[in-house]
Amino acid sequence: MIAGVLRRSSLPSRQTLSAALASFNSCISHNLTPATTGASVSSRFTLASSPNSFGIRARNIHIRSEPSMIVPAGIASQGYATVTKDRKNEIKKAKIKISPDNVRPLSRKEIALQKEAAEESTSKIKGTKICIAIRSFVNPEKQAWCLPPHTRKVAMPDTRTLYTVLRSPHVDKKSREQFEMRFKKRFLVIKAQSHELSKKLFWLKRYRILGAQYELQFHCKTRLDMTQVLGNINGSTTNAY
């Protein structure tokens, strides 16, 4: 530990600084040697105490060097840390890189299992594959569009009625036979506002209903004769109020 007091009254001269540093260095080099474990330097430097000079006063400067560390024979110092030889061997073994020669090649069964796992990673149900459900409808004849296989095929809504009748002629009178009748709807009426048309058309295309008939209804309150205006629109219905 070096303790000193530096006081500055004005700008020092070069000769004053060089003389002070030279005497300080000579004192330290004279009293300190590599073999010494402790040294005490007590010196006082008194320079010109005029207001235009630089004054250095080092009072009771104590310099203590720590004892040299004794290194055992089996330990080699590397920087600030010490590592034993056994530890070095362990580190070398841990840093061995796995080369392709050390890796066991996969069997055909393992490769096939990895491929199946990669294919089925997008689905939780075994055997199903998720595909893109939405495709372009620019030219449906050129590009066939289908729903994903895990969803049911959507068509026009229908009603199913299940009948249970007796089988006749038959020996066993308790015999029954079941059949069902399906009534498919040919028309699907969807009522939508103007801001809902795009959403309704999207779902119609998604359910593979590529044909649609639009019916425009105009409701207005006026005293003017609108027959000529509405007559230009084919298939429109006139509601007069």
Curated annotation (Swiss-Prot):
Q: Which Pfam families match?
A: Ribosomal_S10
UniProt keyword annotation of Transit peptide present: yes
Cellular-component GO terms for this entry: mitochondrial small ribosomal subunit; mitochondrion
**UniProt transit peptide range:** 1-54
Alphabetical keyword list: Mitochondrion, Ribonucleoprotein, Ribosomal protein, Transit peptide
Which GO molecular function annotations are given, in alphabetical order? mRNA binding; structural constituent of ribosome
Q: Where in the cell is it found?
A: Mitochondrion
Q: List the disulfide bonds.
A: none
Stored InterPro entries: Ribosomal_uS10, Ribosomal_uS10_dom, Ribosomal_uS10_dom_sf
Q: How does it assemble?
A: Component of the mitochondrial ribosome small subunit.
What is this protein's record name?
Answer: Small ribosomal subunit protein uS10m
Organism of provenance: Arabidopsis thaliana
What does UniProt list as this organism's lineage?
Answer: Eukaryota, Viridiplantae, Streptophyta, Embryophyta, Tracheophyta
